[in-house]
Amino acid sequence: MIRPSRPLLLAVLAAVLAAVGLGGCGGAASRSGDGSGSAGAGADAATMSAGTAPAKPAGSAAGGASQARAGTAGDPWTHLRALATIGAGNRGNRAAGTPGGVATENLIASRLRDAGWAVRFERVSFPFFDERRPPLVELPGGRRLAAGGDVRTLSYSGAGDVRAPVKVVGGGRTDAGCRDGDWDGFPRGQIALVRRGVCPFAAKARRAQGAGAAAIVIEDRDANGRRGPVSGTLGAPGIRIPTVAVDGESGAGLARADGGVRVRVDAVSEQRAARNVVAELPGTAGDRVVMAGAHLDSVPAGPGVNDDGSGVAALLALADRLGRGPRPRDTLRFGFWTAEELGLYGSRAYVRSLSAAERRRVRSYVNLDMVGSPNAVLETYGSGDTEAALRRALDARGPAPAASSIGGASDHASFQRAGIEVGGVFTGASERVGAAEAKRFGARAGQPADPCYHRACDTLANVDRSMVGRVADAVEAGVRSLAG
């Protein structure tokens, strides 16, 4: 997920600013953007027919209704095991637009149908970028820059492996490369070296590509020659040449290089499509709708069993219970959103596809994103009846949840922006747990809530089973309360 509460909210804002060239995340050594905006790719929706030891025992039994249903489709752990298997068998991830993502979509649809829900897919288009190997920049003589420390790939870079002389563009000015005239006489087939500044990275890369550059290296340095490399983005696919950023010292070394320099980027950058899975259970009266959702994709770096397999599994367990029990008054609709990790593309596309009348029908939206963190701090966020229903249900099942800033870092934001009341449950990401929170929830102070956030170790061993069960039971009660 993109964290909906305090510490990572700044990182989310930085990531958004990075896409428009206004800022970045990670401190002075990892900023992105050049001071003016660049448009990102949109998303569309068209309806189609249908490693670190956890702080708490990950395998401990769930309580309440989840424990009573252990081993059945009403138990979240049943679905978590299946999601973990998909991640392990598909290059270690379930990312949108990949085989693991497709397998996740199909699993969710199958289990919802088994529970008696009407299911449909919705196609979503989004920009896809996957860096297969770290970047390589090799100077004459064989010295290589350190990937991550001296050189980084800009997201949506083109792929390639080139060796050519380096040509400094614009004499090292910060605005170098921003104007077409800066590229007059550029020797085709050489590697362009430009300094960061003034216009977006994508603007410099597009002009370099148009001038015939084999690759472009963007240098980030302050007045003393130190800084960087930036963690930046080109905003969307379209640049075909390798595009990397280096720190000031490395940039100076490239400018002095006598002979060919090698630049390699091994990545995939393209528009792709994936599917939301939307399921509905008709109510007994009226035309109001209560919604709940979770994102179905992981980051490419890991299988995402907590982020957000835990939310998906909790909702699938709820779908089974609700599908086999008495129908509520209001219609229930569950959404499993694709490409959340890339920028909320799935939920944004879904909300945009609703007419004004359809939006007014949606009474509430409940979001579940990361509800099984191994060093959990249980939080609710949202407003009105929706958060109140979740809070009451959680209060009845253990320590009262903490209140979190609503933020805009997960799929609830798409609904909130459309004027729909939202609420959600969250158990923490990479932020460290404070002493008071640790005492309240039995967590370890000073340790991350989820030490495997966005990492390859976000496996089944990284999930607190009892916490997922508690959340599933509480959300079931909350949704029943909202739906009547």
Identify the meaning behind each predicted range.
Residues 148-178, 235-305, 317-320, 324, ...:
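Soluble metallo-hydrolase cores and metallopeptidase-like ectodomains found primarily
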Residues 96-98, 146-246, 303, 401:
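Extracellular/luminal Protease-associated
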Residues 300, 327, 337-440:
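Metal-dependent peptidase/peptidase-like ectodomains
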Residues 64, 68-99, 124, 297, ...:
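N-terminal capping segment at the start of a domain
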Residues 434-484:
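His/Asp/Glu-rich mid-to-C-terminal helical/loop segments that flank catalytic regions of hydrolases
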Residues 78-81, 85-189:
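Noncatalytic luminal/extracellular "stalk/propeptide" segments of secretory-pathway proteins
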Residues 26-29:
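Bacterial signal peptide processing site
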Residues 74-91, 99-101, 109-115, 177-180, ...:
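Catalytic-core environment of secreted peptidases
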